[in-house]
Amino acid sequence: MYMAQKAKKKSKLRHAEYYDMQKTFDSLYADSKSGEVFGHLMDIISAPSNIKLAFRNIKGNDGSHTAGTDGRTIESLAVMPEDKFVKLIQKQFRRYEPKAVKRVEIPKPNGKMRPLGIPCIIDRIVQQCILQVMEPICEAKFYEHSYGFRPCRSAENAISYAYGLAQRNKLHYVVDVDVKGFFDNVDHRKLLKQIWTLGIRDTKLIQIIKAMLKAPIEMPDGETVLLSKGTPQGGILSPLLANIVLNELDWWIASQWDEMVRHMKHPCKMTYYPNGAEKKCNSYTALKKSNLKEMRIVRYADDFKIFCRTKEDAEKTYYAVKDWLWKRLKLEVSDEKSKVTNLRKRD
């Protein structure tokens, strides 16, 4: 699985270089890192090279052969002359109206069903064009320990970091928070504000994303519904939008401890014992004795765990996070599925 993901990412990099877009993406990342804002992204998004790259990336996905509500697949676009195809997609950007998203349900390992939204193939191309340009801008602002659906990151990386927190940092109490129906409950207005805050300020692009979020959903029984919240799982842009929503949580948790360690008045160079454990300097020790709770977050999409030093800290953290998620993001936490676990305690 991991090797397949690496091969797929390398393939996308080769495609970007082939269509001469990689330098543009690198520049977007660097500008975002330095605090630039972006008011004219549609010129890049609708550029022929970016559209051709989007087609190439979509074509490599198994899902490209699955039809949306219009019955079309990637094959129907592949037979078009290249210049005609590019003009078709550019026309979508001028006045974008997404077609209905096809809702299907697939079984989960626990026997329940997971709803997936399948956009029409042209809408998938449009989303891919946007993803390619938004991703480097967002990557420059994302927290380093979120691992889901990000370039050059994997579940294995998340597990490795979590293992280190428990073994080297001795953070043995884990807060496991379950958000009720995360993808179905994303607040559209809040999400659009978060996109703006990340420096993406092209109003035309914001309007297109807003239209995507409000695309009608064709249910399995044939009924068409309009949703006022949520971003359907299955959409190409949905994983990035999910990371944008929860990036604010990542940095809020980090501000409680991680960033304090990083920006101490007298920071010290970390050194290590032969077994890999960190040697803590005096400044770090003083920070531990303060009223701040030591906590670290590890997140993979909407699945996240917060590592704490004591049971009391973990329980306080759970209620603080639950309160924060509701007040800031309008997301509810399931008390039944959430828990605090002592990793040293064997079943």
What are these regions (language model features)?
Residues 76-98:
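Amphipathic alpha-helical blocks
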Residues 4, 20, 37, 117, ...:
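Duplex nucleic acid-engaging cores and interfaces of nucleic-acid transaction enzymes
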Residues 93, 100, 141-145, 150-153, ...:
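Conserved polymerase palm-domain catalytic core
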Residues 54-58, 129, 208-213:
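Short alpha-helical scaffolding segments that buttress acidic/His motifs in well-ordered protein cores
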Residues 35-38, 48, 133, 228-233:
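Charged structural interfaces that engage phosphate-rich ligands
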Residues 104-112, 134, 225:
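Residues forming anionic-ligand binding surfaces in small-molecule and nucleic-acid pockets
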Residues 1-83:
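Non-catalytic, polymerase-adjacent accessory regions of viral genome-replication enzymes
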Residues 96-98, 108-110, 122, 156:
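A short catalytic or substrate-binding loop motif that flags glycine-/basic-rich loops and adjacent residues
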